[in-house]
């Protein structure tokens, strides 16, 4: 199928009259990609079709199977009367016409083929603007022609035929960019633009070409991946069918031995179905291969090749235009200058002169011949006549130009016209050695030729006129149409004979060859059926239509003959434009022409191919087969000798038979063949074929099994460690506490070993400890700032006074402190307190570790260490001996009899002796820390020894406030410290330790900054300036008032200043344990978190919040939000219990508070009744209803707060049993509980009904924003006119006559059980 590509349209004489600057040679137009094309003819055109080998024949089946048929395809005979020029331009018409047909019938008969032919000819002859300049441009002429030709050549979009290839859109898109380049050239040529604009337009063409080429290749890669994936799936399915056929074959052999014919017939049918499916699969695989090859060929040969050609033509066009501008600038030299040509310029002018001489001498002779040359048809003759006419016009214009030149140049001197011989050193081979000189005095004039430029601008107009005239003549004159068709048919046969006459058979090479001169003619006449190109051998094989022979063409010879007309690349592009299937075999491409990505892919693919080749070599294949065979043999031996017998012993026979793991033993039993039985049978055959049952075999079996097990164990161990990490979920997790324990244990073992090594080396631990002795000047927390020691302040001052003046205690006869034990949990500040006491007393501290005092190389060394420690300390008194984790080496004595433990007890005894001896030597205090003082030996805790025990508890609220305030002064901006309500912060940090409280102020400030909206780009720009010039500003300048003022202004400008509202907002959002979060951070919800899903939860939360706001002096609602990340979403309310000024006094609950709590429990339940549609009630309020029943029961039975104010208490938690009472009295108690229960329900219902608008507004805003604060709730109540309750708030004062519900009294015994068993 032929088509005309928009990227390669040319004139009929494009191969003979192409411009010289297109002769770039085969090297310059070498494609940058490997191109592999294929003939895209139909599958019926192939001489051979693929045979699908029947499955039955492969596996030995004897039944009748479907066999794939081989179709015989032959070339159809084409009648001479039905052939027209080419596939695309051929007109099929019968050679005999009926003379009786009317004029209208004849016109109707020839209209359609003629219009089709004319359309194709018009498309073939119409130039495209993007390729007009490089295809037909010739050396320039003077500006006279430009002034006469003011008509602009209109751009006409080439409408491609329906049979065009799929990449024509990319070509059109690139041609649109090329049209911009051509317009730019025209503008610059008219001196209305700059030359740089041409370069920019060319760059735009290159960029667009790269973009389009990338799109084409990405589409190709995507299609290739999809098709190859489908092909792999089909291959796997085919392999599976083969495996199934093998299994059916084995079954048929078994059935054949048993004589079961019916089952044999069923197997035969199954095999037929499988064979049919197998054949279809391979047919589909062939189709996929064809599609893959077609897509690759089409993409690379058409899409990419056309884009590359367009880009190169544009580059040549720009080069030609630049030469034209240079030549114009050369002509514009002032008249006073003397023309002096260089040697290279003379050579170029001689080349142009020879070319123009040949054109002017040969073409007129050709046109004057009566018989047209065999290579020219009538169209070519008409074209030559037109060229002759243009040459005559050119000569006339040239004579006029010479006359005008004579008039202007007479003033320079006498006219001289003579022939000058070129010197031998400057002569160019192949050109005349003499040239004509035209001189006016000393001025030389060179007259250019005008025909080239005139032909260029008249080409398009001539095409349009010729096409219109031919079409009109064919439609009007029927006889002319018949004659035209007959001539075309005759011309086709004549063209084929001419081409065949240029072929011969080379007996030496045993091949048919074709003259390279005949190839362009055969291509232009569309006589070539297909072509194969081998660039590495520089040959081409062409096949003519209707002939099965391939003709050899020498590309090198062709390149030499047509070097000036584009060479072989021009021929290749013309073949693509004519739709000739051309396949380019793989060839060597220089690495310099490949991009980095292509070079990387080339290296990787080459390496992959090399490894595949090595893997398929005989040596590697034999080694691989040997190793796999050995592994299989070992597996079979282990399974037969160990695994299969164990399985048969453990699993009963009946169970194995049902699982398909055993063959039937009875005739009536049947079982299908399973993979297990197949594996067992193959393993048994393999095992029996190698088992010799001698000692040597068993010995080697044990050796092989041991080696195999060792390797397999380490492989699985490696995979267990590495595979999870590669998959992305890390190694198998163990208990972190156990891992931490082993690390700590290893550390202590290392320390103990290290101490023993030092002792062996003669290192004294006591000397080492005193070498580390230091005075504490700046403790972590000064003693005056310690907030949790108010109750122990007097004892601590006593210890400090003793250390400062030990003699004062001795003179007064007071008992001096001998040992101090600081007890507290981790993080309470035990070590900080010891250092603070040392700093306050201004005495040194000796830090002793437990491992340094323990037993060493001999028995009793620990006691000696203690004696030496205290002796040295007395010499250096006053001093503090500080021991951390005192319970590690001062534990309870008498639990063990081991020698090591006995030495430990001697260590404690010596420590007791030293503590008792303090009366003689003062100024030494043993200060130790521990978490559990009960683990220390009681003798050490008796009076007179370590009797000063400081218990560090969790700080109180006031102490936490002081700790927070002190930490804020150190870490926060001083201006922000007073903006925070530290009392409120201390209430929310109850469970935090002092060391954690110090981090809260910094977290508050950072969270406040995170909640602000900042301009990140502006902030980063300022930060970069600060980082660059901060070292230039001196420190004294920063401390000035002006610098501080400017800093504050800059902070305000960047929005970094924090206000009191920002800090209060952060404090309100603090979590109960001191963790600060900027609002509620939600994860991805587990369900679709829509408005319908959120509505029940929002109603539940809004009811709780509103009832809390309406009750006076009750708990405070701080936050209200919806949490979609919980199970199916959840509504949340954060309510803080009142601790002062309300209904709860301390830890005791008043009657008023319990009644308010009872009313509060009905808030969410009543809200759901009011806002949810009937029947959509849920169980979200069930826990609160249960809580209300519990409160009502406790008020009546335990507290005596019934509706009748009876003080009788009927149940106590510490009583042996409940108060005995009759059934009637129990009914009365149940009635009281129900009465107060219903009173609370009615009270809550009335409150919410009066504030229904407020409830709806809270629900609506909660659904919209998903979070509301206490301020938001107060605003909603105020804006919507909420009605709050006032004090006194009592349920017993409500007018109530009879209980609304008698649910407790409907049945006899159950109310008793419910009443007495109610949770309290």
From Swiss-Prot:
Q: Phenotype of the disruptant?
A: Embryo defective.
Q: Which domain of life is it from?
A: Eukaryota
Read off the transit peptide span from the entry.
1-43
Provide a GO CC annotation, any one: chloroplast envelope
- Give the residues the record marks as binding ATP: 824-831
InterPro entries found in the cross-reference section: AAA+_ATPase, ATPase_AAA_core, P-loop_NTPase, Peptidase_M41, Peptidase_M41-like
Transmembrane stretches in the record are 571-591, 633-653, 695-715
Read off the SUPFAM superfamilies from this record: FtsH protease domain-like (SSF140990), P-loop containing nucleoside triphosphate hydrolases (SSF52540)
One Pfam family here: AAA
**Protein name as it appears in the record:** Probable inactive ATP-dependent zinc metalloprotease FTSHI 5, chloroplastic
Organism from which the protein derives: Arabidopsis thaliana
Question: Gene symbol?
Answer: FTSHI5
């Amino acid at each position: 199928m032929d088509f005309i590509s928009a990227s390669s349209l040319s004139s009929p004489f494009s191969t003979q009259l192409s411009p010289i600057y297109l002769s770039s040679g085969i090297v310059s137009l070498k494609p940058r990609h490997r191109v592999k094309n294929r003939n895209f003819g139909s599958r019926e055109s192939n001489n051979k079709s693929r045979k699908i080998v029947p499955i039955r024949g492969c596996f030995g089946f004897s039944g009748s199977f479907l066999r794939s048929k081989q179709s015989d395809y032959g070339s159809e005979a084409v009648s001479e009367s039905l052939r027209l020029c080419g596939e695309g331009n051929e007109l099929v018409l019968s050679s005999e016409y009926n003379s009786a047909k009317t004029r209208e019938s004849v016109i109707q008969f020839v209209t359609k083929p003629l219009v089709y032919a004319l359309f194709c000819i018009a498309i073939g002859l119409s130039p495209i603007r993007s390729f007009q300049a490089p295809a037909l441009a010739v050396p320039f002429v003077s500006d006279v022609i430009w002034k006469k030709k003011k008509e602009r050549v209109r751009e006409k979009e080439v409408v491609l035929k329906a049979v065009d290839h799929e990449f024509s859109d990319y070509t059109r898109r690139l041609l649109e960019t090329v049209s911009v380049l051509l317009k730019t050239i025209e503008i610059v040529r008219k001196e209305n633009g700059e030359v740089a604009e041409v370069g920019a337009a060319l760059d735009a063409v290159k960029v667009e070409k790269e973009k389009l080429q990338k799109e084409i290749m990405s589409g190709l890669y995507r299609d290739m991946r999809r098709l190859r994936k489908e092909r792999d799936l089909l291959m796997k399915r085919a392999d599976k069918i083969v495996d199934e056929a093998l299994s059916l074959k084995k079954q048929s052999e078994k059935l054949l031995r048993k004589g079961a014919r019916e089952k044999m017939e069923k197997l035969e049918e199954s095999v037929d179905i499988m064979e049919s499916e197998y054949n279809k699969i391979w047919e589909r695989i062939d189709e996929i291969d064809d599609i893959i090859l077609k897509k690759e060929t089409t993409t690379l040969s058409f899409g990419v090749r056309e884009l590359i050609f367009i880009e190169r033509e544009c580059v040549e066009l720009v080069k030609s235009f630049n030469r034209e501008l240079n030549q114009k600038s050369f002509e514009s030299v002032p008249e006073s200058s003397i023309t002096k040509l260089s040697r290279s310029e003379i050579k170029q002018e001689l080349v142009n002169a020879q070319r123009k001489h040949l054109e002017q001498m040969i073409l007129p002779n050709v046109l004057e011949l009566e018989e047209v040359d065999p290579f020219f048809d009538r169209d070519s003759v008409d074209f030559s006549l037109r060229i002759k006419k243009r040459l005559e016009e050119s000569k006339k214009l040239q004579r006029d130009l010479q006359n005008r030149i004579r008039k202007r140049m007479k003033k320079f001197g006498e006219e001289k016209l003579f022939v000058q011989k070129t010197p031998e050193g400057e002569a160019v081979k192949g050109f005349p050695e003499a040239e004509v000189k035209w001189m006016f005095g000393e001025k030389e004039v060179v007259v250019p030729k005008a025909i080239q430029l005139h032909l260029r601008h008249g080409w398009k107009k001539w095409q349009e006129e010729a096409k219109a005239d031919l079409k009109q003549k064919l439609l009007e004159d029927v006889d002319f149409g018949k004659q035209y068709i007959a001539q075309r048919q005759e011309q086709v046969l004549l063209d084929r004979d001419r081409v065949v006459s240029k072929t011969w058979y080379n007996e030496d090479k045993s091949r048919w060859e074709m003259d390279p001169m005949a190839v362009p003619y055969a291509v232009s006449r569309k006589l070539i059926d297909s072509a194969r190109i081998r660039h590495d051998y520089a040959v081409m094989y062409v096949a003519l239509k209707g002939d099965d022979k391939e003709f050899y063409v020498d590309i090198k010879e062709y390149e030499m003959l047509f070097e000036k007309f584009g060479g072989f690349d021009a021929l290749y592009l013309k073949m693509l434009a004519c739709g000739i299937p051309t396949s380019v075999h793989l060839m060597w491409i220089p690495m310099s022409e490949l991009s980095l990505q292509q070079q990387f892919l080339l290296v990787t693919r080459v390496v992959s191919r090399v490894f595949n080749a090595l893997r398929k070599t005989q040596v590697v294949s034999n080694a691989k087969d040997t190793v796999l065979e050995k592994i299989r043999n070992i597996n079979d031996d282990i399974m037969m000798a160990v695994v299969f017998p164990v399985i048969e012993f453990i699993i009963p026979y009946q169970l194995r038979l049902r699982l398909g793991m055993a063959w039937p033993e009875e005739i009536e039993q049947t079982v299908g063949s399973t993979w297990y039985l197949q594996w067992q049978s193959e393993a048994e055959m393999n095992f029996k074929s190698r088992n010799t049952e001698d000692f040597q075999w068993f010995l080697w079996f044990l050796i092989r099994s041991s080696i195999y097990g060792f390797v397999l164990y380490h492989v699985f161990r490696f995979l267990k460690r590495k595979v999870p990490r590669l998959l992305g979920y890390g190694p198998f997790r163990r208990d972190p506490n156990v891992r931490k324990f082993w690390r700590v244990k290893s550390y202590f073992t290392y320390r103990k070993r290290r101490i023993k090594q030092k002792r062996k080396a003669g290192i004294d631990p006591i000397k080492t400890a005193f070498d580390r002795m230091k005075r504490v000047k700046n403790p972590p927390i000064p003693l005056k700032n310690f907030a949790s020691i108010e109750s122990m302040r007097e004892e601590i001052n006593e210890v400090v006074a003793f250390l400062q003046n030990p003699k004062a205690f001795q003179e007064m006869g007071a008992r001096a402190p001998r040992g101090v034990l600081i007890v507290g949990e981790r993080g309470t500040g035990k070590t900080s307190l010891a250092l603070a006491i040392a700093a306050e007393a201004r005495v040194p501290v000796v830090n002793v570790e437990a491992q340094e005092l323990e037993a060493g190389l001999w028995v009793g060394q620990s006691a000696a260490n203690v004696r030496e420690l205290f002796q040295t300390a007395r010499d250096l008194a006053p001093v503090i001996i500080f021991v951390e984790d005192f319970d590690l080496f001062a534990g309870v004595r008498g639990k063990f009899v081991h020698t090591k433990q006995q030495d430990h007890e001697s260590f404690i005894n010596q420590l007791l002796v030293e503590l008792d001896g303090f009366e003689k030597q003062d100024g030494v205090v043993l200060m130790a820390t521990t978490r559990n003082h009960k683990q220390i030996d009681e003798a050490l805790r008796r009076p007179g020894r370590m009797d000063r025990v400081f218990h560090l508890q969790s700080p109180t609220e006031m102490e936490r406030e002081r700790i927070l305030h002190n930490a804020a002064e150190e870490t926060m901006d001083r201006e922000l410290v007073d903006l925070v309500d530290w009392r409120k912060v201390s209430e929310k940090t109850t469970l935090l330790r002092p060391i954690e409280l110090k981090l809260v102020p910094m977290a508050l400030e950072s969270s406040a900054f995170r909640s602000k909206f900042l301009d990140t780009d502006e902030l980063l720009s300022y930060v970069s300036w600060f980082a660059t010039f901060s070292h230039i500003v001196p420190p004294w300048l920063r401390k000035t008032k002006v610098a501080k003022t400017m800093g504050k202004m800059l902070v305000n400008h960047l929005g970094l200043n924090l206000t009191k509202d920002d800090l209060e907002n952060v404090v309100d959002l603090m979590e109960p344990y001191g963790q600060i979060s900027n609002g509620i951070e939600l994860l991805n919800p587990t369900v679709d978190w829509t408005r319908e899903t959120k509505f029940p939860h929002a109603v539940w939360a809004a009811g709780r919040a509103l009832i809390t706001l309406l009750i006076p002096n009750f708990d405070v609602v701080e936050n209200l939000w919806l949490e979609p990340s919980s199970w199916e979403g959840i509504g949340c309310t954060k309510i803080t219990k009142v601790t002062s000024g309300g209904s709860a006094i301390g830890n005791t609950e008043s009657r008023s508070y319990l009644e308010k709590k009872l009313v509060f429990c009905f808030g969410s339940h009543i809200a759901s009744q009011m806002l949810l549609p009937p029947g959509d009630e849920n169980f979200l309020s069930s826990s609160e209803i249960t809580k209300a029943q519990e409160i009502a029961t406790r008020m009546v039975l335990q507290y005596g707060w019934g509706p009748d104010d009876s003080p009788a208490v009927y149940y106590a938690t510490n009583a042996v049993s409940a108060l005995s009472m009759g059934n009637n009295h129990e009914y009365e108690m149940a009635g009281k509980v129900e009465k107060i229960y219903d009173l609370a329900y009615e009270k809550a219902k009335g409150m919410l009904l009066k504030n229904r608008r407020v409830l709806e507004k809270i629900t609506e805003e909660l659904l919209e924003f998903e979070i509301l604060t206490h301020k938001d709730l107060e605003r909603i109540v105020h804006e919507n006119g909420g009605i709050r309750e006032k004090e006194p708030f009592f349920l017993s004062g409500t007018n109530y006559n009879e209980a609304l519900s008698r649910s407790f009294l409907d049945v006899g015994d159950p109310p008793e059980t419910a009443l007495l068993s109610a949770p309290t």
